[in-house]
Amino acid sequence: MYAVIRAGSKQFRVSPGDVIKVDSAPHSESGKLEIADVLAVSNGQGKFGSPENATVTAEILGDGRGDKILVFHYKRKKQYKKLQGHRQGFTALKITEINVDGEKFTIDDMPKKEAAPAKARRSTKKAAAAE
C-alpha cells in the first residue's frame, strides 16, 4: 500500500512506516499532521487522479536543518570573491497511516519484508593458501 502526496512544492511516494523530510512546515504541538493533498493511492489496483476521501496521517519527529550548501561568487581579474553558505530547514515526518474511503492502512497491515539470503563469499588465492 502506498500513496503519492504533495507536501510543500514536492511530491513523495509514501507507505506506512516511511520517514520523509519536507520543507519546514508550520505545525502544531500535537505531534500529528494530516495531509489531505493525495494525488494517487495504490493497493494492487491503483486509484489515480486525486482520490476523494483520501488522507495521509503523519507523526512529527522534529525540525532540523540540512547539510550546508556553499555558494561561491567571483569576478575574474577584479579580485572579488564572496562565499556564502545556506542550510535549508526541514520537518521530519513518519507516515503512520493511509486512509482511503474509510479504510485505514497502518504499518501493521504492510507485508513483512523477508531478509535476503546471505551471499556466498568467494575465496581468494591468499585465503585458500592460508587454510
From Swiss-Prot:
GO MF term (any one): structural constituent of ribosome
Compositionally biased intervals (Basic and acidic residues): 106-116
Statement: the UniProt record of this protein carries the keyword Iron-sulfur: no
Cellular-component GO terms for this entry: cytoplasm; ribonucleoprotein complex; ribosome
Cysteines paired by S-S bonds: none
SUPFAM superfamilies: L21p-like
Keyword Ribonucleoprotein: yes
Keyword terms: Ribonucleoprotein, Ribosomal protein, RNA-binding, rRNA-binding
Region (Disordered): 106-131
GO biological process: translation
Taxonomy, superkingdom: Bacteria
Membership in a protein family: Belongs to the bacterial ribosomal protein bL21 family.
Subunit and interaction comment: Part of the 50S ribosomal subunit. Contacts protein L20.
Function comment: This protein binds to 23S rRNA in the presence of protein L20.
UniProt-listed NCBIfam families: L21
Entry protein name: Large ribosomal subunit protein bL21
Organism: Koribacter versatilis (strain Ellin345)
Protein encoded by which gene: rplU
